[in-house]
A protein has these predicted regions:
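Basic, flexible Lys/Arg- and Gly-enriched helix-loop patches that mediate nucleic-acid binding at interfaces
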Residues: 2-240
């Protein structure tokens, strides 16, 4: 039995390629160890059978953006640094239209954008793509967000019109919001760059109590049929 070495080193020796090429083959899901795909270049091997799959290419996986339907009550969601934890606990949507096979590399160095509070549910974005990170992290808040908010109580007369103009509450002016009734207990609220607590305070400012909220749209991108607790890839032609 030989001493264990990194899979990338063993593969490079076996193929006569560079260590970097070997790493790319492994990260791309092209390498099997005793019949199992291994995506970690640092995985230790000794006498196992190493196999390079047909059609293998030593190319970097392009950066991706992932969309998650966050469940209510997830305490990790308010922490942007917990992207990998959130995604690890979710499931890839079986009806994802993207022709991509999930790889470990797709979950590395993901940035959580526009995080939701613990009590909220709905659409969250994780991205490795610089242009998307810049657009969604823009402090000027140019991108609309749409929420369905379950409420209790009786609103004051003309309350929804006040929200559209910008209303003061607890010593600060809240962001302008377009609001309409979806049914007797649900409001559809559209606004830009809400801060934590803003939706609750918007409701309180017109005499309502927020029971729950769900984000259903960011920019032009709707959550649509993505099930709770599942994620999918952002499609090549989809835009926020």
């Amino acid at each position: 039995m030989t001493d264990p070495i990194r899979l990338s080193k063993r593969l490079a020796e076996q193929l006569g390629c560079s260590r970097r090429e070997a790493e790319l083959y492994i990260e791309g899901g092209w390498v099997k160890v005793d019949g199992n795909v291994i995506e970690a270049p640092y995985y230790k091997v000794d006498d196992q059978r190493i196999e390079l799959l047909p059609g293998a290419t030593a190319a970097e996986l392009p950066p991706v953006t992932l969309l998650l339907h966050k469940p209510s009550g997830d305490p990790t969601a308010a922490d942007p640094s917990s992207a990998q934890l959130q995604l690890a606990e979710a499931s890839h949507w079986s009806s994802d239209d993207a022709r991509l096979t999930p790889r470990d590399r797709h979950f590395a160095r993901q940035t959580a954008l526009m995080p939701l509070e613990e009590h909220a549910s709905g659409l969250i974005v994780f991205s490795q793509q610089r242009e998307i990170i810049r657009a969604l992290d823009d402090p000027r808040g140019k991108i609309e967000q749409e929420y369905i908010v379950e409420v209790e109580g009786e609103p004051e007369d003309g309350g929804l019109a006040l929200l559209a103009k910008g209303i003061g509450h607890r010593g600060r002016v809240l962001p302008k919001a377009k609001a309409s009734w979806q049914n007797e207990t649900r409001l559809r609220i559209v606004l830009k760059a809400p801060q934590p607590g803003d939706l609750r305070q918007l409701c309180e400012a017109i005499g309502l109590q927020m029971v729950s909220c769900k984000r259903i749209r960011i920019g032009r991108l709707s959550m649509a049929k993505l099930p709770v607790g599942h994620w999918r890839f952002l499609g090549e032609h989809e835009r926020f």
